[in-house]
Curated annotation (Swiss-Prot):
This is Nucleobase-ascorbate transporter 1. Keywords: Membrane, Transmembrane, Transmembrane helix, Transport. InterPro entries: NCS2. Pfam families: Xan_ur_permease. GO terms for molecular function: transmembrane transporter activity. The gene is NAT1.
Length: 520
């Protein structure tokens, strides 16, 4: 048995740069730009999904993308400096789609005949709902309530939650890749080939460029290939879905984007407030808290840091609430969460440096003001990003499951909790999503639209369903007798900021701010 024994390891050993170590500046800049290119996929996808339904034009969509990128840069910088201080990119969230769809379909907005006017009024309604709903994260974060709740977490409970943060994104993987298999599949194979089979090839000095910059290299190659296919007329006469997924000549997005535009608060006009809209939006805020918590825990492991203590998690959620407030003030059209794909990129490149993400935030802010520049990159076909998602989401899921090494997986109790939370965490949201797709309304369908949006949003989130099941069962089944089996002897020292000496190294605030905001 000794030959097959792999003792649990608190920190991953295969990473080259941890949270506090930094690559050389030229490498840092390229890695930061790679993070920017990756987060563009979600930043362009959400407005493409929502803006037309709101009545917006291509010009409106370009402006929303700019605003989303600009605010994402600010949120990422704030989170990396004053929040969890983990190398996590904060961007637009798809968890907000259901409550936003409820607002879009509000009868008072639907009766506006002019499309542009309807877009403006809908955007203002979304802004008002985000501003009110942001108070949930701000209060739960800065009051340390979320930190108190996190004391119920254990390695056994967090393994399926973090796993579902990755696995729950499966619809953005091969289903989107398959819409243009001739672009998506080569991208998938190329990334796997370069990062796994050619990672030791170093044509330039000692930098493993294929492992360090796979997105820059692969996106460039496959994008050029896609341009050639489009120019050669390969998609002429093809179904509209194929053309939309494969073609690169999205001239409207580029032509309607301004050369220079500086997003500013209340640029769409004063927000409007509705009790129903705000309650509906609160569900998405709760979901994004759960998903971000799982993403933070995954990011900490991929950055060779300790699991974030309760105080740090609460601090991060509080700053994320500030981010949602900024979304409402600027009008990004959606709320925010930690982008799971960028967390996966830490593992793919083996670089967990905080500085890389901070520089990436600078790219987001600067390039968001240069409309045409950002629009060019935003026109990268979705299947290219879907291929990356297959790898990166899967990697985050595996990081989550790696927490099971600290538990006793020969225990039927632990097997039951892990299996049930993983299975139902995928099965329940999929059932809700299929119901929505078939009928264009959720499984919960009463006369109270805000109530429908609230519950449907909660149960369409794999990580949230997984958290409810895993944490409840883990804290109600043979708790005292199973402390060691649950992994608590290892986990308990990370509950408090001073429980492990390394926490101070990883999570202390800059500029000596801990004097004014001491850990609780």
């Amino acid at each position: 048995m000794a030959e097959i024994s792999h003792p649990p390891m608190e920190q991953l050993q295969d990473l080259e740069y941890c949270i506090d170590s930094n690559p050389p500046w030229p490498e840092t800049v390229l890695l930061a730009f790679q993070n920017y290119i990756l987060m563009l996929g979600t930043s362009a996808f959400i407005p493409a999904l929502l803006v037309p339904a709101m009545g917006g034009s291509d010009g409106d969509r370009a402006r929303v993308i700019q605003t989303l990128l600009f605010v994402a840069g600010i949120k990422t910088l704030l989170q990396a400096l004053f929040g969890t201080r983990l190398p996590a990119v904060v961007g637009g969230s798809l968890a907000y789609v259901v409550p936003i769809a409820y607002i879009i379909n509000d009868s008072s907005l639907q009766k506006i005949s002019n499309d542009h006017e309807r877009f403006i009024h809908t955007m203002r309604a979304i802004q008002g709902a985000l501003i009110v709903a942001s108070s949930i994260q701000i209060i739960l974060g800065y009051s340390q309530v979320w930190g108190l709740f996190s004391r119920f977490f254990s390695p056994l409970g967090m393994a399926p939650v973090v796993g579902l943060v990755g696995l729950g994104m499966f619809q953005r993987g091969f289903p989107q890749l398959g819409n243009c298999i001739e672009i998506g599949l080569p991208m998938l194979l190329l990334v796997i080939g370069l990062t796994q089979y050619l990672k030791h090839v170093r044509p330039f000095k000692d930098v493993p460029i294929f492992e360090r910059f796979p997105i820059l290299i692969c996106v460039t190659i496959v994008w050029i290939y896609a341009v050639i296919l489009t120019a050669s007329g390969a998609y002429r006469g093809k179904p509209s879905l194929t053309q939309h997924s494969c073609r690169t000549d999205k001239a409207n997005l580029i032509s309607t984007a301004p050369w220079f535009k500086f997003p500013y608060p209340l640029q769409w006009g004063p927000p409007t407030f509705s009790v129903g809209h705000s309650f509906a939006m609160m569900s998405a805020v709760l979901v994004s808290m759960v998903e971000s918590t799982g993403a933070y825990i995954a990011a900490s492991r991929l950055a060779i840091a300790t699991p974030p203590p309760a105080y740090v998690l609460s601090r991060g959620i509080g700053w994320q609430g500030i981010g949602v407030l900024l979304d409402g003030l600027f009008g990004t059209g959606t709320g925010s969460t930690v982008l799971v794909e960028n967390v996966g990129l830490l593992g793919l490149t083996r670089v967990g440096s905080r500085r890389v993400v901070q520089v990436s935030a600078g790219f987001m802010i600067v390039f968001s003001t240069l409309g045409k520049f950002g629009a060019v990159f935003a026109s990268i076909p979705v299947p290219i990003y879907a291929a990356l998602h297959c790898i990166l989401f899967g990697l985050v899921a595996a990081v989550g499951l790696s927490f099971l090494q600290f538990t006793n997986m020969n225990s039927m109790r632990n097997l039951m909790i892990t299996g049930l939370s993983l299975f139902l965490g995928i099965s329940i949201p999929q059932f809700f999503a299929q119901y929505w797709d078939a009928r264009h309304y959720g499984l919960v369908h009463t006369n109270a639209g805000w109530f429908n949006a609230f519950l449907n949003t909660l149960f369409m989130s794999p990580a949230t369903v997984g958290l409810i099941i895993a944490v409840f069962m883990d804290n109600t089944m043979e708790v005292e007798r199973s402390k060691k089996d649950r992994g608590m002897p290892w986990w308990v020292k990370f509950r408090t900021f001073r429980g492990d000496n390394r926490n101070e190294e990883f999570y202390t605030l800059p500029f000596n701010l801990n004097r004014f905001f001491p850990p609780t």
